[in-house]
Amino acid sequence: MKMLRALLLCLSLVFFLAFQIVVSEIQLGSKLVVGENTLWVSNNGDFALGFFNPPGLLNRFSIGIWFNSNSIPYDQRKVVWVAGAGVVVSDNSSYFELTRNGELVLFDSLLGVPVWNSKTNRFSVSSALLRDDGNLVLLKDREEIVWQSFGTPTDTLLPNQKFPAFEMLRAASENSRSSYYSLHLEDSGRLELRWESNITFWSSGNEVVKKKKKKKNIGAVLTSEGALFLEDQDLMRPVWSVFGEDHNDTVKFRFLRLDRDGNLRMYSWNEDSRIWKPVWQAVENQCRVFATCGSQVCSFNSSGYTECNCPFNAFVSVSDPKCLVPYQKPGCKSGFNMVKFKNLELYGIYPANDSVISQISSQRCKKLCLENSACTAVTYTNDGEPQCRMKLTRYISGYSDPSLSSISYVKTCLDPIAVDPNNVSKESPVTVTKSHSICIPCLVGATSTTLVLFLGFQLGIVVYIYRRKKKLAKKKAERFSKATNPKGVMIFSVDEIKAMTDNFDNNIGPQIFKGVMPENELVAVKEVEATLTEERKFRSSASKIGTMHHKNLANLEGYCCELGRRFLVYEYAKNGSILDHIVDPLRSKKLTWRIRTDTCLSVAKALCYLHMECREFVSHGNLNCGNILLGEDLEAKLTEYGFGLCAADKDVEDFGKTVLALITGRYEPEGVVSEWVYREWIGGRKETVVDKGLEGCFDVEELERVLRISFWCVQTDERLRPSMGEVVKVLEGTLSVDPPPPPFACARSSPTNSSESSQSLYEP
């Protein structure tokens, strides 16, 4: 028995030594390999650095630091830092190395490229060290810190870790993609919790630094005693503070984390219960965390815990896996109804810009939604000031609670009521009491005569209707010909279109012809398929488009809808389309880097105008390089807008693909170019994707910004795509853009695991 115990003890020691390497100093050339399961451990053993499996990602590995104390069970050893904010590798031969030139590098052997590095090869790094406080540092001359993990936090702060102004924590997400939630410290001295980039749903209070005196030497810090301070280093004192409920208690381990549900919490290790206990949280009511339930509604159950549910299931198809408000089909011929939900507060999340109308009644609020084709739901509140919040998206989140006075109304289509076969009244049985003799020849003669008269009458009606329709159609054509509708758009006949284009003799593109108006004004005439939209909708759309004016939209001069053919007459663009230039090596030389980036911005502004600045939402529906024209000064003008019916996110996706085609000089509608560009970008070879015709004349920083926003636009999950307003700000340089998660199936790390798709391979 003693021999067996001794053997087990030896095996345990061998196992421990095989998986942990306690080092006081990490030498250049040191390496951790996925398949070897080795660790770098701090001197006190409280922290370890190594590869781990992110939750829910089978055969995927990230490199990070976690609590490693023997007093903490393995399932409670929380990760406190991850290289690259969630970068994953998949092959067992992938590794993390402190290279000879002083860089920390995470290398994916399957892709054959480094997917993250510390970018410290110019700092004369001599060694690395995982300190007892959990900070991984790179040292110059074994003393001076030139890089530290505390300086690149992910979602967690450890005691005494500084959180300076303009720094950010980003919550982890279940699929390892970049999360929607982030924590920011403004230079005004205020901590802010944000959803995406523009929704602040919690802050630490009023600004503590006056606007004229904003400065960078203000920071947040979690103390080992369990307090969170905002410190002004000039004043040498806290300007804001909160305390955990166990403040000043003897607790060995603490951390502050931005959790996946969007709330900021302070945790302490409880030795008695052997669990991490939350001792403070920023948002007391979890349902007040913006979009904490995604596109569902948050509420509290009888046990006091939050739960997410979908109140719209009764109005959507059972085949729709998402909880979305009903799709407002334009062809709903039976009208719309507003379904009432008491004690429910709704708000749009994609995009998160509800239209707010004050001093209004609930009836008027509902009516406005019914009159607006883009409106999907409204929330009405009257807490002293009546307010109507109109949602213009199907992606809606909310909060339900009996204490809420809010009333929400969801727009639904009134489908025709089908006849219930169970309610159809059955005929009463007829009892024949007496039989009579029947004259068969008389019956046949009468029936034949009646049938002939009936058919003759029907034939007469058909002939009359046909002749009347033909006459009305002729009058209608004459009425529209050589006319202008009330909104100023010319309406032409087919004969006029033929005369204008010299019988379609001058073809300048696919179904596009050069024409001359009677006033010698040059125009471009585009023939569109008559099957795309019915005549009434085509005329309505053309009339509406004629009222739109933006410098980056080609003016619609007129249209033709006659004899089964449809034409659009646009102002003439001298230099043709972007597609004409991309496919022609000689013409592509006109597209300098500045022209290309200006074109991206111009198209973004045009789409932003259509989506957000018109009285009603207008989609493009078919954006591509072929319908972006270049005027005399090579200024972009968008055509064929307003006739396609689609959601905003489809236009955003098409925009991203178009931008990538413009930057690379390669046009592939199937999206092959987009996937290739992403692989090059993630491999650190972004310069190779630029059109060779530019001969290296481009701005690297601008290229990075354009590629990042393009990858966000083409995300497979449409909820991750930005609004066109955000795209404009990014391209203008007034809004920063985070590194995007892999947008395509091609960005998977392993071809053998197709179910585990789209993992994050980006730099922080």
Swiss-Prot record:
Domain Apple intervals: 332-413
Record's keyword annotation contains Glycoprotein: yes
Membrane topology: Single-pass type I membrane protein
Stored InterPro entries: Bulb-type_lectin_dom (IPR001480), Bulb-type_lectin_dom_sf (IPR036426), Kinase-like_dom_sf (IPR011009), Pan_app (IPR003609), Prot_kinase_dom (IPR000719), S_locus_glycoprot_dom (IPR000858), Ser-Thr/Tyr_kinase_cat_dom (IPR001245), SRK-like_kinase (IPR024171)
Top class in the EC scheme: transferase
Compositional bias annotation for Low complexity: 749-764
Domain Protein kinase as annotated: residue spans: 466-764
Secretion signal span: 1-24
Region (Disordered): 738-764
PROSITE patterns in alphabetical order: BULB_LECTIN, PAN, PROTEIN_KINASE_DOM
Keywords: ATP-binding, Cell membrane, Disulfide bond, EGF-like domain, Glycoprotein, Kinase, Lectin, Membrane, Nucleotide-binding, Receptor, Repeat, Serine/threonine-protein kinase, Signal, Transferase, Transmembrane, Transmembrane helix
Binding site for ATP: 508-516, 526
Single GO MF annotation: calmodulin binding
Superkingdom of the source species: Eukaryota
Record's protein name: G-type lectin S-receptor-like serine/threonine-protein kinase SD3-1
Native organism: Arabidopsis thaliana
